[in-house]
């Protein structure tokens, strides 16, 4: 890696950690808060230095557009963790009946998350709130998200709304607008201009801890 000052290294590590854990890049305000900086100008300065050294790339026309460029051979922590989970097998002991009992399997197989995710780039997010409860996705659940930047109408996606936070909703395109539809009769859909929404991924599975 190119030579960095201590502060540049700290900011680069923060950006890597934030992006790995959230699945999207931080805003300048979040960087300032996370780094304990009182001035956004200082954030801009360090981001500019990291960009000039080839460690970041930005799209100046989009919010949260910082892309961390990693040295060859350096795997994202989230991807490394996902790979470890995907190869960790769990014993599959057979089916369980909700009606009459069924025969147990004497020679259990092994199932890994890789059987479900395949070669996709997948990350995990924990759900906060009840907006998707009618899809049986509730507060505290974990969703498996395939990292993509486009999705078909009706798919459950992780969407980043400009000047706002990420949200988990079904996506529908309606002309020049996008409708982010909750699955909760008590909540209203979010309608925003199409250009202000970025798809971060689509949900491919749900995990629940009892």
UniProtKB/Swiss-Prot annotation:
The active site is at residues 131, 169. Residues 28-48 bind DNA. The lineage of its organism: Bacteria, Pseudomonadati, Acidobacteriota, Terriglobia, Terriglobales. InterPro entries: LexA (IPR006200), LexA-like (IPR039418), LexA/Signal_pep-like_sf (IPR036286), LexA_DNA-bd_dom (IPR006199), LexA_repressor (IPR050077), Peptidase_S24_LexA (IPR006197), Peptidase_S24_S26A/B/C (IPR015927), WH-like_DNA-bd_sf (IPR036388). The record marks 98-99 as: Cleavage. One of its GO terms (molecular function) is serine-type endopeptidase activity. Represses a number of genes involved in the response to DNA damage (SOS response), including recA and lexA. In the presence of single-stranded DNA, RecA interacts with LexA causing an autocatalytic cleavage which disrupts the DNA-binding part of LexA, leading to derepression of the SOS regulon and eventually DNA repair. Keywords: Autocatalytic cleavage, DNA damage, DNA repair, DNA replication, DNA-binding, Hydrolase, Repressor, SOS response, Transcription, Transcription regulation. Gene3D superfamilies: Umud Fragment, subunit A, Winged helix-like DNA-binding domain superfamily/Winged helix DNA-binding domain. Belongs to the peptidase S24 family. Its EC number is 3.4.21.88. It comes from Koribacter versatilis (strain Ellin345). It catalyses: Hydrolysis of Ala-|-Gly bond in repressor LexA. GO terms for biological process: DNA repair; DNA replication; negative regulation of DNA-templated transcription; proteolysis; SOS response. It is an enzyme of class 3 (hydrolase). The keyword Transcription applies. Homodimer. This is LexA repressor.
């Amino acid at each position: 890696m190119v030579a960095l000052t201590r502060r540049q290294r700290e900011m680069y590590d923060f950006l890597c950690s934030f992006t790995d854990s959230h699945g999207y890049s931080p805003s300048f305000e979040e960087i300032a808060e996370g780094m304990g900086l009182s001035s956004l100008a200082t954030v801009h300065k360090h981001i500019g230095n990291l960009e000039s050294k080839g460690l970041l790339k930005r799209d100046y026309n989009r919010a949260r557009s910082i892309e961390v460029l990693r040295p060859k051979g350096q795997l994202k922590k989230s991807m490394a963790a996902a790979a470890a989970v995907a190869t960790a097998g769990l014993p599959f002991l057979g089916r369980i009946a909700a009606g009459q009992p069924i025969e147990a399997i004497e020679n259990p197989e092994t199932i890994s998350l890789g059987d479900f995710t395949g070669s996709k780039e997948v990350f995990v997010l924990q759900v906060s709130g009840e907006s998707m409860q009618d899809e049986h996705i509730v507060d505290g659940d974990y969703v498996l998200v395939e990292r993509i930047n486009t999705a078909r109408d009706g798919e459950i996606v992780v969407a980043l709304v400009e000047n706002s936070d990420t949200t988990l909703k079904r996506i529908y395109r309606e002309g020049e607008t996008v409708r982010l539809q909750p699955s909760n009769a008590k909540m209203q859909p979010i309608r925003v201009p199409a250009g202000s929404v970025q798809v971060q991924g689509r949900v491919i599975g749900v995990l629940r801890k009892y």
